[in-house]
Amino acid sequence: MEEGLQRCFVLHRRPYSESSLILDVFSEEYGRLSIISKGARSKRSNLKGVLQAFTPLLMKWSGKGSMRTLRQAETISLGIPLTGINLYSAMYINELLVRVVEQETPYPALFLDYLTALTELAQSTNPEPALRRFELALLSAMGYGVDFLHCAGSGEMVSPEMTYRYREQQGFMASIRHDPLMSFKGNELIAISERRFTTPEQLKAAKRFTRIALKPYLGGKPLKSRELFLPRTRSILK
């Protein structure tokens, strides 16, 4: 079966045989797919420079099962310009998708969230807000539902100045005891819910929450993208 042209991004690529590539692709309509591009590494290939990460693509493939065969690929536009810490941040996002998102499952809204995150990274000097927003969008797409605006114990709206302790499978409970990892201020929970961070403390709180929530999906295996980071970038994504 051959599909029509689909909007895609290459998340990861690796050499296969003497002249081919195996691509991990994130498509708007079909989600993550493994696609073999035969002859893409040969000197005469017209795909040289096309199958790159962070470049919006139109792709057509054929076949069924766990490995499709690329039939056509073309760029929609130039690659999204990412350098330095923002490039490392985008690599982190790609690895999150590879590790967390199951293949063959459509996530059209998450595809747009991914495009938005890359665009924000290209335009920002601080990648943290874009990273936190994408992590929260990813968790939402995975069905990780958390009510940030109501106390799980009383059902009342969270108070900006009160402290709440996060309990997995339950939500946020009002607490007078502070836990460095699991406690959050009400204003931090409101900021996370709105995906709008106005203070460094709110960003740090969002990072703590996404690390807690993503841990079951990532297990104990470290993210390889972090090994590439300079010491100053590790502080953002650790």
From Swiss-Prot:
Q: Name one GO cellular component term.
A: bacterial nucleoid
Any Pfam family the entry gives: RecO_N
GO BP of this protein: DNA recombination; double-strand break repair
Q: Which UniProt keywords apply?
A: DNA damage, DNA recombination, DNA repair
User: Which Gene3D superfamilies does this one have?
Assistant: Nucleic acid-binding proteins, Recombination protein O, C-terminal domain
* Signal peptide interval: none
InterPro entries from the entry?
A: ARFGAP/RecO, DNA_rep/recomb_RecO_N, NA-bd_OB-fold, RecO, RecO_C
Q: Which residues form a coiled coil?
A: none
Q: Which SUPFAM superfamilies match?
A: ArfGap/RecO-like zinc finger, Nucleic acid-binding proteins
Keyword Lyase belongs to the record:
no
| Superkingdom of source | Bacteria
Task: Please report which protein family the annotation says this sequence is part of.
Answer: Belongs to the RecO family.
What HAMAP family does the database record attribute to this sequence?
A: RecO (MF_00201)
UniProt function note: Involved in DNA repair and RecF pathway recombination.
Instruction: List the protein's name.
Output: DNA repair protein RecO
Q: Which organism is it from?
A: Aliivibrio fischeri (strain ATCC 700601 / ES114) (Vibrio fischeri)
